[in-house]
Amino acid sequence: MQKLKQQVFDANMDLPRYGLVTFTWGNVSAIDRERGLVVIKPSGVAYETMKVDDMVVVDMDGKVVEGGYRPSSDTATHLALYQRYPSLGGVVHTHSTHATAWAQAGMAIPALGTTHADYFFGDIPCTRALSEEEVQGEYELNTGKVIIETLGEVEPLHTPGIVVYQHGPFAWGKDAHDAVHNAVVMEEVAKMAWIARGINPALNPIDDYLMNKHFMRKHGPNAYYGQK
């Protein structure tokens, strides 16, 4: 597990590096599918003092199996996503400014241009509000459930992120590094959408044919973007 702990530590340290977190407002995890174990950031530990061995290992029920700290308070959300989507290898949650602003506004981040379409096949959805019962009950688990409910039958790696109503963004990927990459892109396209809508409030979404081209040339079966 040491290799995975290093990867998760590095991914967590990328959050302040890319300006996605203030104080301790974020967490990254990754899963070892063969062992059924998840490595995640400890709860409330400052990035400035955090070390590789501070990462916490939990089983799929959230029980700590390795580590001297409590795991992130969002652990149950991460576990719900891993259990539902076998293609996920890493999950990240932040309160990055622009993506969180869309969450607080209760609005999906609209697909307005090719930067968005290179990573997200359509709008980045916003969940419904959690009920009082859901919040007072198993809040973090119910956050995972409302993400799953909102995604429906969507392939999660085609829409590798979401904003939770009045809360903030979650992103995911094939591993922890990929999840952080998608979180960085989500914050950038959230900012771009806010600026673009300010310039032209009547702006239309990106044309489907242009969105399809940009997404499929990177992620489709005949993708040709980048090097082999």
Curated annotation (Swiss-Prot):
Names of required cofactors: Zn(2+)
InterPro entries in alphabetical order: Aldolase_class_II_sugar_metab (IPR050197), Aldolase_II/adducin_N (IPR001303), Aldolase_II/adducin_N_sf (IPR036409), UlaF (IPR023499)
EC class name: isomerase
EC number: 5.1.3.4
GO BP annotations, alphabetical order: L-ascorbic acid catabolic process; pentose catabolic process
Catalytic activity: L-ribulose 5-phosphate = D-xylulose 5-phosphate
Keywords: Carbohydrate metabolism, Isomerase, Metal-binding, Zinc
Induction line: Induced by L-ascorbate. Repressed by UlaR.
Protein's pathway: Cofactor degradation; L-ascorbate degradation; D-xylulose 5-phosphate from L-ascorbate: step 4/4
CDD domains reported for this sequence: Aldolase_II
GO cellular component, one term: cytosol
Residues at which Zn(2+) binds: 74, 93, 95, 167
Function: Catalyzes the isomerization of L-ribulose 5-phosphate to D-xylulose 5-phosphate. Is involved in the anaerobic L-ascorbate utilization.
UniProt record similarity statement: Belongs to the aldolase class II family. AraD/FucA subfamily.
Name of this protein: L-ribulose-5-phosphate 4-epimerase UlaF
Species for this entry: Salmonella paratyphi C (strain RKS4594)
